[in-house]
């Protein structure tokens, strides 16, 4: 049944007030603070209907109402307005998520995680997706000092790893380029399982007197492929939960911290598959997380999902602000990853 406009406006006012103040909302508060053009008595009757419909709930007979999970869902789907970013906020996002072709993806994403936590005042979580059977896309070798070479490895999933190796004698740039060409011709497209003894011996044979260079490179090569084949979970701003007075309660705080410290739970909660996903309270599949909301989105490299970034907090988070921040940050991550791919 379609809810009438007046009830929607009252519900919107209740949720906005509860998000901002964390206190149950009464009809007199709505009548005074929100210019709805109706009396407190009418609002009270409408609130009784909203409670009966399951959109708000009353904690005690003498208290006002607070939104239910069902109420928040209607709010997110139909009532909230996504704000525009200020120029200062847009500049902050672009400045923090650095654009650099040699910038390692995990560092870029960790910067984005810190930024989301800072801008939303909530706990931000990043889950890097498992890139099973990752392979080498390219290897670059650069002289940086006498007897020191910078090795840059890039996998198909966009992971970049920089390593410095020391060599016994200086190597000319032309020789270094030839070594890199041989390595790329032999290793490009190979997974860690495919780099077997036969491949290694063939590379050393082609490198001749520079075979020792490959011995120095191999451990780093294996490291990046192992890293690309694993799933990592990072978090930032855990203590931000204490910005919400209700989490001064030791039991509620312990409940939240136990969720944040459980990698299995975070791995399940942060499973967005496309654009921004919002899971509210009981919509979370994990029982321990049913007092919280999770807002997350996938970031991509070359069109391929590379990880999930999002926040977890109480159900009264400022949804419109959080969704906008995550949308903008993910767009900026994707733009930078695309530039890396084209560089």
From Swiss-Prot:
Keyword line: Repressor, Stress response, Transcription, Transcription regulation
A single BP term in Gene Ontology: negative regulation of DNA-templated transcription
Induction record: By heat shock.
Protein origin, superkingdom: Bacteria
InterPro entries membership: GAF-like_dom_sf, HrcA, HrcA_C, WH-like_DNA-bd_sf, WH_DNA-bd_sf, WHTH_HrcA_DNA-bd, WHTH_transcript_rep_HrcA_IDD
GO molecular function, one term: DNA binding
Family the UniProt entry places it in: Belongs to the HrcA family.
Function: Negative regulator of class I heat shock genes (grpE-dnaK-dnaJ and groELS operons). Prevents heat-shock induction of these operons.
Protein name from the UniProt record: Heat-inducible transcription repressor HrcA
Classification of source organism: Bacteria, Bacillati, Bacillota, Clostridia, Eubacteriales
Gene name tied to this protein: hrcA
């Amino acid at each position: 049944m379609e809810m009438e406009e007046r009830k929607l406006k009252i519900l919107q006012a209740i949720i906005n007030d509860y998000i901002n103040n964390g206190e149950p909302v009464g009809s007199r508060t709505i009548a005074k603070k929100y210019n709805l053009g109706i009396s407190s008595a009418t609002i009270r009757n409408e609130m009784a209907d909203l409670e009966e419909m399951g959109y708000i709930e009353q904690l005690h007979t003498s208290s006002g109402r607070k939104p239910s999970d069902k109420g928040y869902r209607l709010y997110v789907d139909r009532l909230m307005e996504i704000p525009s970013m200020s120029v200062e906020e847009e500049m902050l996002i672009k400045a923090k998520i650095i654009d650099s072709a040699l910038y390692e993806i995990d560092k870029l994403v960790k910067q984005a995680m810190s930024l989301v936590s800072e801008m939303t005042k909530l706990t931000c979580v990043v889950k890097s997706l498992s890139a099973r059977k990752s392979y080498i896309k390219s290897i670059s070798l650069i002289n940086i000092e006498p007897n020191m070479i910078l090795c840059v490895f890039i996998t198909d999933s966009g992971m970049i790893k920089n390593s410095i190796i020391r060599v016994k004698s200086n190597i000319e740039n032309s020789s270094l380029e030839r070594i890199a060409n041989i390595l790329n011709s032999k290793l490009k497209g190979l997974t860690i399982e495919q780099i077997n003894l036969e491949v290694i011996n063939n590379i050393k044979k082609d490198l001749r007197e520079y075979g020792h260079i490959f011995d120095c490179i191999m451990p780093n090569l294996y490291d990046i492929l192992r890293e690309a084949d694993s799933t990592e979970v990072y978090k930032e701003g855990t203590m931000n939960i204490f910005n919400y007075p209700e989490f001064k309660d030791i039991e509620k705080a312990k409940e939240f911290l136990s969720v944040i410290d459980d990698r299995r739970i975070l791995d399940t909660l942060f499973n967005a598959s496309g654009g921004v996903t919002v899971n509210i309270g009981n919509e979370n599949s994990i029982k321990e997380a049913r007092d919280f909301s999770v807002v997350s989105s996938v970031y991509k490299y070359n069109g391929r999902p590379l990880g999930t970034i999002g926040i977890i907090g109480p159900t009264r988070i400022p949804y419109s602000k959080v969704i906008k921040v995550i949308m903008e940050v993910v767009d900026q991550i994707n733009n930078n990853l695309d530039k890396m791919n084209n560089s």
